[in-house]
UniProtKB/Swiss-Prot annotation:
The gene is rplP. This is Large ribosomal subunit protein uL16. Coiled coil: none annotated. It comes from Caulobacter sp. (strain K31). Part of the 50S ribosomal subunit. PANTHER family: 50S/60S RIBOSOMAL PROTEIN L16 (PTHR12220), LARGE RIBOSOMAL SUBUNIT PROTEIN UL16M (PTHR12220:SF13). Belongs to the universal ribosomal protein uL16 family. InterPro entries: Ribosomal_uL16 (IPR047873), Ribosomal_uL16_bact-type (IPR000114), Ribosomal_uL16_CS (IPR020798), Ribosomal_uL16_dom (IPR016180), Ribosomal_uL16_sf (IPR036920).
Length: 146
């Protein structure tokens, strides 16, 4: 599972995800991508489950790029512990994902397999998503320029 090797501080504030994604909104590597439509924290386990679903559907052909990384520590206190007495230990790691962020990219497989793989990967994530293609991105850029 993904997690940082080293961090400056062990624990962080919860934080909020405001607005749309500042970067990572265009396809950089593959021909197909999975784009977030709403803000959410996505755990390392969810990222791994989605990656496995995508890879399995592609029958290990082509290439998968994971464009998000779980760098936010999520803490939790044990069950049946009273309030107070400090913040809990780091339980797991999550990635903050804003709307518009490309989370996964794939290439090297036919159109129908690519779309189905990303649909199955999206089912493992707690947010609504859209499948985007390089053709969609090109048309959007041309429309912006005009």
């Amino acid at each position: 599972m993904l997690s940082p090797k080293k961090t400056k501080y062990r624990k962080q504030f919860k934080g909020r995800i405001h607005g749309t994604s500042k970067g990572g909104t265009l396809l950089n590597f593959g021909s197909y991508g999975l784009k977030a439509v709403e803000p959410e924290r996505i755990t390392a386990r969810q990222i791994e489950a989605a990656r496995r679903a995508i890879t399995r559907q592609m029958k290990r052909q082509g290439r998968v790029w994971i464009r998000i990384f779980p760098d936010v520590p999520v803490t939790g206190k044990p069950a049946e512990v009273r309030m107070g007495k400090g913040k809990g230990a780091v339980d797991h790691w999550a990635a903050r994902v804003a709307p518009g962020r490309i989370m996964f990219e794939i290439d090297g497989v036919p159109d129908d397999i690519a779309r189905e793989a990303l649909r199955l990967g999206a089912a493992k994530l707690p947010i609504r998503t859209r499948v985007v293609t390089r053709i969609d991105a090109g048309a959007a850029l041309e429309a912006e320029a005009a």
